[in-house]
From Swiss-Prot:
PROSITE patterns linked to this entry: PROFILIN
The protein's assembly and partners: Occurs in many kinds of cells as a complex with monomeric actin in a 1:1 ratio.
Residues spanning the membrane: none
Presence of the UniProt keyword Cytoplasm in the record: yes
One GO MF term: actin monomer binding
PANTHER family named among the record's database cross-references: PROFILIN (PTHR11604), PROFILIN-2 (PTHR11604:SF49)
Subcellular location: Cytoplasm, Cytoskeleton
Organism: Solanum lycopersicum
The protein's name in its UniProt record: Profilin-2
Protein origin, superkingdom: Eukaryota
Entries under SMART domains matching the protein: PROF
Length: 131
């Protein structure tokens, strides 16, 4: 299965009638493995900031999480495993696997819990596959 298939079928799938607005699978070095057509263009330093927060949880909390120039307020995640952010009625979930970052961005009517479930389910599967 291609990485694009994972994005299209597992991240952009419908969940209770809702779906993510954009999603991507990105290598921990910032290379894009696959992404939705409307995934924001991000800067390398934004991925570096995310990776630094996984290494030392809490580093993004004072400044916020940036992706594609959009600032998200960092909310409760799972140290070294999941970073969650909120911006208005939407937000972002980032799950770290052995080799990649699974990123889902949502807006209403999708809920944070639905986004978390979609992103983390795929991330957990990839971890089980040693990816």
């Amino acid at each position: 299965m291609s990485w694009q298939t994972y994005v299209d079928e597992h991240l952009l799938c419908e969940n209770e009638g809702n779906h993510l607005t954009s999603a991507a699978i990105i290598g921990q070095d910032g290379t894009v493995w696959a992404q939705s057509a409307n995934f924001p263009q991000f800067k390398p330093e934004e991925i570096t900031g995310i990776m630094n927060d996984f290494a030392v949880p809490g580093t993004l909390a004072p400044t916020g999480l940036y992706l594609g120039g959009t600032k998200y307020m960092v909310i409760q995640g799972e140290p070294e495993a999941v970073i969650r952010g909120k911006k208005g009625p939407g937000g972002i979930t980032i799950k770290k696997t052995n080799q990649a970052l699974i990123i889902g961005i949502y807006d209403e009517p999708m809920t944070p819990g639905q986004c978390n479930m979609i992103v983390e389910r795929l991330g957990d599967y990839l971890i089980e596959q040693s990816l």
